[in-house]
């Protein structure tokens, strides 16, 4: 294991587990951490034996491509990390998980090896874990005494302000709420991808 990649789910816990437990989805993450801090291990990783997950997709970081081959993925249950803060319980569970990972996987003792999905796939519009993930807190709690790398969010502030307004349109029914925010996340990704393409002229 060379890297750890942090994501948000874009749907609630039930829909997250349904997606990752369905072989036809062609997606899997090693861990899911619910808003109450409950940790779900879907692909083995906590005991020092790790299997490949399918969470990174087409990805690149500092010349390394295809990070599914060399990373662990953690999904934090959150409809959109550019709209909703992550919970205290999730940060506490991240501390527990990080302690295990640093024990078993020496490369993860280096704070530079922890990334967001947006940092390895922002060119595809990925925007997680998002603006509201507290990277300084994460590094302070898990890498005390080590210099924390900069992990800027790819979501522009103007786009985030527009996303925040969508909370007023959120459906009341839980089943509809997940679908609504999943659609918002897809719209977020498309917008960020178009911005990236405009900057590169592609």
Model-derived segments and spans:
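Basic/polar, cationic surfaces and motifs that engage anionic cell-wall
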Residues: 80-202
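Active-site-adjacent loop/helix surface patches within enzyme catalytic domains
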Residues: 2-108
């Amino acid at each position: 294991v060379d890297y750890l990649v942090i994501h948000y789910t874009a749907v609630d816990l039930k829909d997250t587990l349904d997606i990752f437990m369905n072989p036809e989805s062609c997606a899997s993450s090693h861990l899911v951490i619910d808003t109450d801090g409950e940790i779900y291990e879907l692909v083995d990783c906590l005991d020092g034996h790790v299997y490949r997950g399918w969470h990174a997709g087409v990805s690149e970081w500092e010349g390394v491509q295809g990070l599914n081959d060399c990373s662990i993925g953690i999904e934090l249950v959150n409809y959109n990390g550019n709209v909703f803060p992550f919970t205290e319980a999730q940060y506490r569970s991240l501390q527990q998980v990080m302690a295990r990972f640093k024990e078993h996987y020496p490369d993860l003792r280096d704070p530079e090896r922890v990334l967001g999905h947006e940092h390895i796939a922002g060119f595809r519009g990925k925007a997680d874990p998002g603006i509201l993930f507290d990277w300084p807190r994460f590094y302070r709690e898990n890498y005390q005494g080590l210099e924390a790398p900069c992990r800027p969010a790819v979501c522009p502030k103007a786009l985030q302000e527009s996303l925040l307004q969508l909370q007023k349109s959120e459906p009341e029914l839980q089943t509809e709420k997940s679908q609504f925010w999943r659609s918002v996340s897809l719209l977020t990704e498309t917008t960020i991808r178009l911005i990236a393409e405009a900057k590169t002229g592609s």
